[in-house]
Curated annotation (Swiss-Prot):
Biased composition (Basic and acidic residues): 551-562, 606-616, 629-657, 707-738
TPR repeats: 209-242, 306-339, 341-373, 381-414
Keyword Phosphoprotein included in the entry's annotation: yes
Matching InterPro entries: NA-bd_OB-fold, S1_domain, TPR-like_helical_dom_sf, TPR_rpt, TTC14
PANTHER family, alphabetized: TETRATRICOPEPTIDE REPEAT PROTEIN 14 (PTHR23184:SF9)
The organism of origin for this protein: Mus musculus (Mouse)
Protein name, UniProt field: Tetratricopeptide repeat protein 14
Molecular-function GO term, any one: nucleic acid binding
Record-listed Phosphoserine modification sites: S666
Annotated stretches, region: Disordered: 35-55, 463-743
Compositional bias annotation for Polar residues: 539-550, 594-605, 661-673
Listed Gene3D superfamilies: Nucleic acid-binding proteins (2.40.50.140), Tetratricopeptide repeat domain (1.25.40.10)
Residues in S1 motif domain copies: 125-207
Lineage of producing organism: Eukaryota, Metazoa, Chordata, Craniata, Vertebrata
Signal peptide: none
C-alpha cells in the first residue's frame, strides 16, 4: 500500500472516508494496520464549524464511496509509475502519437480565467516563445505566443508581455550595441527569469543559465517559424477552420494511426503492459484463466490454421505431389513454428526422399514440443536405425553404434535397433580380429623386408670390397710399370757408366792380379758383396706397392731377363771396380746362417701362392731359356770352382760378421746394410751357379784384360749355338735363372716383400 497517498486522501476527505474504508476494506490485512493508526487523530478532531462545509462534504459522499470501494486498487504500489520523468521540452513526435492543440481552444473559456491560470502555473526556468514588439535602450519587449516546455496553454490571444533587460541580452560582437542584432517581429525563445504574479509581469533572459540543468542544451535567441512547437502549429490550423472537432483532428493525424502508439505511450508513462491497471473488477488479470489471454488464444488460432495446411499437405503426399506437400508443411510451420503435426509430416517426407538427417531434426523438435507424441517417437526410431545402416555401409561403425543406442534409449522394445546393434558388434569383433591378423602379417613382411635389405647390403659390401681389391691391384700394377721404367733407366745408366769407367778398369787390371791371391781367403766373397752393396744407393720403401702382387713381379722379372746382356756387362764392370780397390770388407761373414734364415722366411711367402708362381716361372723359363743358353754354358765351368771356394770360406767369414756394423752410419743405412746382407746371401745360395759364373767371368777378366768385353759383345751369338744345353739347365733350376741378372735394388725389394709376407703370416687371424 502507498501510505503517503492514503494519508493525503484521508486528510482531504476527513473521518467520513475513514469510516467508509473500515466498512469496505475490513477483510484486507494491509488496511487493518494502517487504519488503526490513521483513525486516532481523526477521533480527537473537532467537528467542522460551519454548515456550509457540511453541505460540501455531502456533495463528496459519492466520491468517498468510490474511493472506499476501490481502495485496494487505487492505493496499490503497482499503480506507482517507475518510468523516468518525461522531458518537459515539446518534441516533434508527430509520427509516434497524435499531437493535439490545447484543450481550452475547443472550449468556451473567458480570457480572464485563462490569464489567471497561466500566471498560476508558470514557474521560473520555463521556456516561452514570443515576438519582439518594441526595442528600447534598457532592453526589448516581447509578446508571448506559446510555451516551449512544461504545460500546454493557448496564450496567443491573451497579449501577455515580457521584458528582456539589456544585461540579459548576449552581445554578438566585441564592440557594439547588443540590441542592434535584434529587430521588431523576430521570434525569440527565452527563459523565464522572474515572475510578478500580483502585477502579472514577467522578466526573461537569453542566457542558458536561466534554464534548469536538464534543459541547458536548448538554444535561446532568434528562431524560425519551423522551430515552433507542433501543438502551436496545429492550433493555428484550428483557428483557420474552427468547425473541426477534437476527434476529427485527432484521427486525421499520422501518429494516431501508428500501430505502436500504445507501446510508446505506455513506456513513456511507465505503465506495465503485462498487468494493466483497471478499476473494473471483471477486467482484472487475476480473475482470468491463462487460456483466456491473448497469447493462448493466438496459439490456438495459429494451431488450427496450421492443421488445415497439414491436412492439405498430407493429401498431396498421398497422391504423390511431394513438392506441393512440402510447400504446405512449410506454410504451416511459418504460421506455427512449434506445430508438432507439421514437423512430423515434414520429417516423414524428408525420410521418404532420403534426407535422413533433416528428418531426424524434425522428429526431435516434435518430441521436444510434445514428448508423448507416438508417431514422432516411432518415426524417429525407424529413421535412426536406417541412418545407422547407411553409416555402417560407409564403415563408420562408431557413429552407427551411437544411432542404434539412441534409438534404444527412445524405445527399449524396438527390436530392429537391438538386432542391428548385435550384428554391428559381431562384425566389429570380426573386423578387429582380421585387422590383428593383417597387422601380424605386415609385421612379418616388414621383418622379411628388413632381412632381405640386410642381405642386399651385405652383397653390396662384398662387391665394394671386391672392387676395392681390383682397384688396389690396378694401382699396384701401375706401380710395377713405374718400377719397370726405373729398371730400364737403371740399366741405361749402368751402360753409360760402363763407358765412362772403361779406361779406369784397364788401369786397375794390374791391381786385380794382386787381389787374385786373396780369393783363397774365406772373406774374399764377403768383400765383393759388401762392395756391391756400397755401389748401389739406398732404395725407396716400395714394399707397399708389391703386396700380394706376385704376378706383376714375375712380369717384371721377365722384362729383366730380356735385358740380361747389358746387365751382365754392368755386373762385370762392377766386379772389376770392387777387385781393383783392394779393400777386404767384413759384410760377407755368416752367409750360411743368413741363408738358412732366409729359407724359412721365403718358405712362408711361397706357400701362399705356389701354384701361380711355379706356373709362371715354368712358362717364363720355357719362353726365355733359349735366349740364355749361350751365356749359361760359358759360365758352367767357373761355377763349380766358385762353389768349392765358398764352402771353404764359410767358417772364416763368421769371424768377420760383427765388423759389418762399422759400415752403417745412420739408422736408415744400417737397416739397408742388414737387408743387403740377407739379400746377398739369398742371391748367393739360391742362385749359386750364377755367382760362380760371374766369378769365373771375373777371373777371365783379370787374365785376359780387354778380351772380356769382346766376349760380352758376342754373347748373343753364343746363345744361339748353346740353346739346347741351356734348356736343360732352365728346367733343373728355374729360380736361379729368374734372379740371375737382376740389379741389387730389385733384390732388396723382393727381400722386403718376403719379410712382410712372413710377418703377415705370423699375425693371429681375427
Amino acid at each position: 500500500m502507498d501510505r503517503d497517498l492514503l494519508r493525503q486522501s484521508l486528510g482531504c476527505h476527513g473521518p467520513a472516508l475513514l469510516s467508509l474504508l473500515r466498512s469496505e476494506q475490513q477483510d484486507n490485512p494491509h488496511f487493518r494496520s494502517l487504519l488503526g493508526t490513521a483513525a486516532e487523530p481523526a477521533r480527537g478532531a473537532a467537528p467542522p464549524p460551519g454548515a456550509g462545509r457540511k453541505e460540501k462534504r455531502v456533495d463528496n459522499i459519492e466520491i468517498q464511496k468510490f474511493i472506499s470501494k476501490k481502495a485496494d486498487l487505487l492505493f496499490a504500489l503497482s499503480w506507482k509509475s517507475d518510468a523516468s520523468p518525461p522531458s518537459e521540452v515539446h518534441d516533434d513526435n508527430d509520427n509516434l502519437y497524435a499531437v493535439m492543440p490545447p484543450l481550452e481552444q475547443f472550449m468556451e473559456m473567458p480570457s480572464m480565467d485563462r490569464r489567471e491560470l497561466f500566471f498560476r502555473d508558470i514557474e521560473r526556468g520555463d521556456i516561452v516563445i514570443g515576438r519582439i514588439s518594441s526595442i528600447r535602450e534598457f532592453g526589448f519587449f516581447m509578446v508571448l505566443i506559446c510555451l516551449g516546455s512544461g504545460i500546454v496553454r493557448d496564450i496567443s490571444h491573451l497579449e501577455i508581455t515580457a521584458l528582456c533587460p539589456l544585461r540579459d541580452v548576449p552581445s554578438h560582437s566585441n564592440h557594439g550595441d547588443p540590441l542592434s542584432y535584434y529587430q521588431t517581429g523576430d521570434i525569440i525563445r527565452a527563459g523565464i527569469k522572474d515572475i510578478d504574479r500580483y502585477h502579472e509581469k514577467l522578466a526573461v533572459s537569453l542566457y542558458s543559465s536561466s534554464l534548469p540543468p536538464h534543459m541547458a542544451g536548448i538554444k535561446l535567441g532568434v528562431i524560425t517559424s519551423e522551430e515552433l512547437p507542433m501543438y502551436y502549429r496545429r492550433s493555428v490550423e484550428l483557428n483557420s477552420n474552427s468547425l473541426e472537432s477534437y476527434e476529427n483532428i485527432m484521427q486525421s493525424s499520422l501518429g494516431f494511426v501508428n500501430p505502436g502508439v500504445v507501446e510508446f505511450l505506455l513506456e513513456k508513462l511507465g505503465i506495465d503492459e503485462s498487468h494493466p491497471p483497471s478499476l473494473m473488477r471483471g477486467l482484472q488479470s487475476k480473475n482470468f484463466s491463462e487460456d483466456d489471454f491473448a497469447s493462448a488464444l493466438r496459439k490456438k488460432q495459429s494451431a488450427s490454421w496450421a492443421l488445415k495446411c497439414v491436412k492439405i499437405g498430407v493429401d498431396y503426399f498421398k497422391v504423390g505431389r511431394h513438392v506441393d506437400a512440402m510447400n504446405e508443411y512449410n506454410k504451416a510451420l511459418e504460421i506455427d513454428k512449434q506445430n508438432v503435426e507439421a514437423l512430423v509430416a515434414r520429417g516423414a517426407l524428408y525420410a521418404t526422399k532420403g534426407s535422413l538427417n533433416k528428418a531426424i531434426e524434425d522428429f526431435e523438435l516434435a518430441l521436444e514440443n510434445c514428448p508423448t507424441h507416438r508417431n514422432a517417437r516411432k518415426y524417429l526410431c525407424q529413421t535412426l536405425v536406417e541412418r545407422g545402416g547407411q553409416l555402417e555401409e560407409e564403415e563408420k561403425f562408431l557413429n552407427a553404434e551411437s544411432y542404434y543406442k539412441k534409438a534404444l534409449t527412445l524405445d527399449e522394445t524396438f527390436k530392429d535397433a537391438e538386432d542391428a546393434l548385435q550384428k554391428l558388434h559381431k562384425y566389429m569383433q570380426k573386423s578387429l580380429e582380421l585387422r590383428e591378423k593383417q597387422a601380424e602379417k605386415e609385421e612379418k613382411q616388414k621383418t622379411k623386408k628388413i632381412e632381405t635389405r640386410a642381405e642386399k647390403l651385405r652383397k653390396l659390401l662384398k662387391e665394394e670390397k671386391r672392387l676395392k681389391k681390383k682397384r688396389r691391384k690396378s694401382s699396384s700394377s701401375s706401380s710395377v710399370s713405374s718400377a719397370d721404367e726405373s729398371v730400364s733407366s737403371s740399366s741405361s745408366s749402368s751402360s753409360s757408366s760402363h763407358k765412362r769407367h772403361k779406361k779406369s778398369k784397364r788401369n786397375r787390371s794390374e791391381s786385380s792380379r794382386s787381389s787374385k791371391r786373396h780369393w783363397s781367403r774365406p772373406s774374399s766373397g764377403h768383400t765383393d758383396q759388401s762392395r756391391k752393396d756400397d755401389c748401389y744407393p739406398v732404395p725407396t720403401n716400395t714394399s707397399a706397392s708389391f703386396l700380394n702382387q706376385k704376378q706383376e713381379v714375375e712380369k717384371l722379372l721377365e722384362k729383366q731377363d730380356r735385358l740380361q746382356c747389358p746387365n751382365a756387362q754392368v755386373k762385370e764392370k762392377e766386379r772389376g771396380l770392387l777387385t781393383s780397390s783392394g779393400e777386404v770388407p767384413d759384410d760377407l761373414g755368416g752367409r750360411s746362417d743368413f741363408y738358412n734364415s732366409y729359407k724359412t722366411q721365403a718358405g712362408s711367402s711361397k706357400t701362399e701362392k705356389p701354384y701361380k708362381s711355379e706356373r709362371h716361372f715354368s712358362r717364363r723359363n720355357s719362353s726365355d731359356s733359349f735366349s740364355r743358353n749361350s751365356e749359361d754354358k760359358m759360365k758352367a765351368s767357373s761355377y763349380r770352382r766358385f762353389e768349392k771356394d765358398t764352402e771353404g770360406r764359410k767358417d772364416h767369414s763368421r769371424r768377420w760378421e760383427p765388423s759389418s756394423v762399422k759400415y752403417s752410419t745412420s739408422p736408415a743405412s744400417s737397416d739397408y746394410s742388414w737387408k743387403s746382407l740377407e739379400k746377398q746371401k739369398k742371391y748367393t745360395y739360391s742362385g749359386s751357379r750364377d755367382v760362380s759364373k760371374h766369378e769365373q767371368r771375373y777371373q777371365l777378366n783379370t787374365n785376359q784384360g780387354e778380351r772380356v768385353y769382346e766376349k760380352e759383345d758376342s754373347c748373343g751369338e753364343g746363345n744361339r749355338n748353346e740353346a739346347p744345353e741351356e734348356m736343360l739347365n732352365s728346367k733343373e733350376q728355374p729360380d736361379s735363372r729368374v734372379k740371375k741378372n737382376l740389379p741389387q735394388n730389385l733384390l732388396n725389394i723382393f727381400n722386403q716383400i718376403a719379410e712382410f709376407e712372413k710377418e703377415k703370416g705370423n699375425k693371429p687371424k681375427k
